[in-house]
C-alpha cells in the first residue's frame, strides 16, 4: 500500500462518532471523548495439555482471523487434576492496535457477527466498570478468512475491546455508535 489508507470505521469515528459522544456527554475537553485503545483476541485451548498438536490449529486460526502472529500463552503453575504442568502451552493471544484494530472491528461488526446462526445481539452487561467490553464467540467459522473444510475442530475465543471511557455508560455509548449490536432491553 503506497498510498495513505485510513480504515473506514476509524474515519467514521473521527468524523461522526466523536461529535455525537461530545454532544451526548458534553465533555470539557476533546481528549475526554472515549476512544478504542486496543482489541485483545484470546483463544484458550485447554485440550492442548493432552494433545500438543491442537495449539498449532489455534495459532493458525488466530493468524488468519487477525492478520497478526499470536503470542503463545503457557500455564503459570501445575495443576494435577487437569494433567497440566507449568510451562505447557494452553492458549494464544493477539493484541491489535492502530489500523489493524480498526480493520478487525470493521470485519467483526459487518461480516462475522451477522454470520452467526440465531444471533440476537450481544449482551450489554459485560462491561468491567471502566468502559471495557468483553464477549465470547463459540466458534471461529463466522470469520470468512477461515475455510470451514480445513478446520480440525471448532474453537471459541474471547474478544476484549479496551476503551478510554471512564465508566460503563460512556463505553456502551461508544460501542453502540461504532455499530456493536447490543440486545434491546425488554420492558
UniProtKB/Swiss-Prot annotation:
Gene Ontology CC terms, in alphabetical order: ribonucleoprotein complex; ribosome
Gene3D superfamilies: 3.30.1440.10
Keywords of this entry: Ribonucleoprotein, Ribosomal protein, RNA-binding, rRNA-binding, tRNA-binding
Keyword Zinc-finger in annotation: no
Gene Ontology molecular functions: rRNA binding; structural constituent of ribosome; tRNA binding
Gene Ontology terms describing biological process: translation
Domain of life: Bacteria
A Pfam family matched in the record: Ribosomal_L5_C
Annotated S-S bridges: none
The protein's assembly and partners: Part of the 50S ribosomal subunit; part of the 5S rRNA/L5/L18/L25 subcomplex. Contacts the 5S rRNA and the P site tRNA. Forms a bridge to the 30S subunit in the 70S ribosome.
PANTHER family tied to this protein: 60S RIBOSOMAL PROTEIN L11-RELATED
Family named by the database record: Belongs to the universal ribosomal protein uL5 family.
Protein name: Large ribosomal subunit protein uL5
Organism, scientific name: Corynebacterium diphtheriae (strain ATCC 700971 / NCTC 13129 / Biotype gravis)
Amino acid at each position: 500500500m503506497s498510498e495513505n489508507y485510513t480504515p473506514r470505521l476509524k474515519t467514521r469515528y473521527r468524523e461522526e462518532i466523536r461529535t455525537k459522544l461530545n454532544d451526548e456527554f458534553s465533555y470539557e475537553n476533546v481528549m475526554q471523548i472515549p476512544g478504542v485503545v486496543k482489541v485483545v483476541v484470546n483463544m484458550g485451548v485447554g485440550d492442548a495439555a493432552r494433545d500438543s498438536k491442537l495449539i498449532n490449529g489455534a495459532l493458525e486460526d488466530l493468524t488468519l482471523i487477525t492478520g497478526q502472529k499470536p503470542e503463545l500463552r503457557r500455564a503459570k503453575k501445575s495443576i494435577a487434576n487437569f494433567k497440566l504442568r507449568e510451562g505447557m502451552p494452553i492458549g494464544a493471544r493477539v493484541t491489535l492496535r492502530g489500523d489493524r484494530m480498526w480493520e478487525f472491528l470493521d470485519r467483526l461488526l459487518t461480516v462475522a457477527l451477522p454470520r452467526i446462526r440465531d444471533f440476537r445481539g450481544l449482551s450489554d452487561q459485560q462491561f468491567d466498570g471502566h468502559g471495557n467490553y468483553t464477549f465470547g464467540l463459540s466458534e471461529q467459522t463466522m470469520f470468512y478468512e477461515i475455510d470451514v473444510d480445513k478446520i480440525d475442530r471448532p474453537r471459541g475465543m474471547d474478544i476484549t475491546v479496551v476503551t478510554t471511557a471512564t465508566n460503563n455508560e460512556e463505553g456502551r455509548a461508544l460501542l453502540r455508535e461504532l455499530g456493536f449490536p447490543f440486545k434491546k432491553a425488554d420492558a
